[in-house]
Amino acid sequence: MDKKLEELVWSRANGICEYCQVPQRFDPINFQIDHIIAEQHQGPTSADNLALACYTCNHQKGPNIAGYDLETNETVPLFNPRKDSWSVHFHWDGAELQGAPIGRVTVHVLAINRDFRIALRRSLIHEGVFPPQ
């Protein structure tokens, strides 16, 4: 990936994971650039298919583009940071991320509400630096 494209992804996201919203400065593991539609699914390495992701979100997401929603009994696409509005699909309930079907499935597949991730967000909330504005 060329440096200019990498810089675009970082600046567009303002150094914040585009899935869980945790800023890089509070995560000891370097963020990664995620192919929203994985290369193995013929997703291009282009600005409209790339998102900044923390290691955990990117690792959990893998090549997935959808998940099964137990509430609607339907296969639902994962949140796409280039096409979907974060605030339409997600909302914070304290340190836990909740959402409508796309948000709910994304939270599940990316394991966004795992205990260690909630603990980090609680600490950041207590310090007054989360969620990002």
PLM segments and residue spans:
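Short cysteine-rich loop/turn motifs with clustered Cys
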Residues: 2-31, 51-61
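Extended charged
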Residues: 3-4, 23-26, 59-133
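Residues at the C-termini of beta-strands that transition into short coil/loop
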Residues: 37, 54-56, 101
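Short linker/helix segments within small regulatory modules
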Residues: 37-50, 82
